[in-house]
Amino acid sequence: MTPDQVIVALDVPDLPKAIALVDRLPGVGFWKVGLELFVGAGPVILAELKDRGKRIFLDLKFHDIPNTMLGACLSASRYEVDLLTLHATAGSQALTLAAQAMAPLPHPPKLLAITLLTSIGDRQLREELQQPLAVDDYVNAMARLARNAGIDGAVCSPQEVAKLRQTCGPEFLLVTPGVRPLWSAPGDQQRVMIPAQAIAAGANYVVIGRPITADPSPEAAWERLCQDLAV
């Protein structure tokens, strides 16, 4: 595993904090911009990242009726980001429309389907969402739905990676946010694994946020992570 397979979550509320963090970590080449930062800073953060030669995972998790999802994906594609998320539970029509719309674009983002948030475990899936399937079966079903609709990949926890790699094949991108180094706390994610294990299981990229960005010394935390990956 190499640092190029690590996407660092830029989970800060505004542009000045985001730029300060990016400039403190010049070795990070791939950043995730989520709802908090995109709403707080607007698309200018994407321009700032591109000006610095960074790759961008725009994690806005679109979930709406098919035509609205289509329009949102087309609007987001103008930013020329690398990865863009949408919920698989929007259904096959919405997913297919989005995938077909990206195909003719000169610089389309890879579309990733959200299968199930990594904060949700079996009990919540069963009792709160009233879903009788176990987490791994539900995630597998959502990933198959996305693949069959022409979506490029999926976001899933590391526990589901190996099964999805078998089910969806080698070309299907798998990005997992539920990873944390051994030296960090698990936070609010329930389905976690260390980065190297997730890659070995078949993930293309891992997403790591607070273990790096919330550390008193993000530079030292990033260096420690890179040392872990080299072992």
Curated annotation (Swiss-Prot):
InterPro entries reported for this sequence: Aldolase_TIM (IPR013785), OMPdecase (IPR014732), OMPdecase_AS (IPR018089), OMPdecase_bac (IPR047596), OMPdeCOase_dom (IPR001754), RibuloseP-bd_barrel (IPR011060)
Pfam families according to UniProt: OMPdecase (PF00215)
Entry annotation: catalytic residues: K61 (proton donor)
Binding positions for substrate per the UniProt entry: 11, 32, 59-68, 118, 180, 189, 209-210
Zinc as UniProt keyword: no
GO cellular component: cytosol
SUPFAM superfamilies attached to this UniProt entry: Ribulose-phoshate binding barrel
Swiss-Prot/TrEMBL GO biological process terms: 'de novo' pyrimidine nucleobase biosynthetic process; 'de novo' UMP biosynthetic process
Catalytic activity, reaction form: orotidine 5'-phosphate + H(+) = UMP + CO2
E.C. no: 4.1.1.23
Keywords associated with the record: Decarboxylase, Lyase, Pyrimidine biosynthesis
Pathway given in the UniProt record: Pyrimidine metabolism; UMP biosynthesis via de novo pathway; UMP from orotate: step 2/2
GO molecular function, one term: orotidine-5'-phosphate decarboxylase activity
Function per UniProt: Catalyzes the decarboxylation of orotidine 5'-monophosphate (OMP) to uridine 5'-monophosphate (UMP).
Family membership: Belongs to the OMP decarboxylase family. Type 1 subfamily.
Xref: PANTHER family: OROTIDINE 5'-PHOSPHATE DECARBOXYLASE
Subunit structure: Homodimer.
Annotated protein name in UniProt: Orotidine 5'-phosphate decarboxylase
Organism of derivation: Synechocystis sp. (strain ATCC 27184 / PCC 6803 / Kazusa)
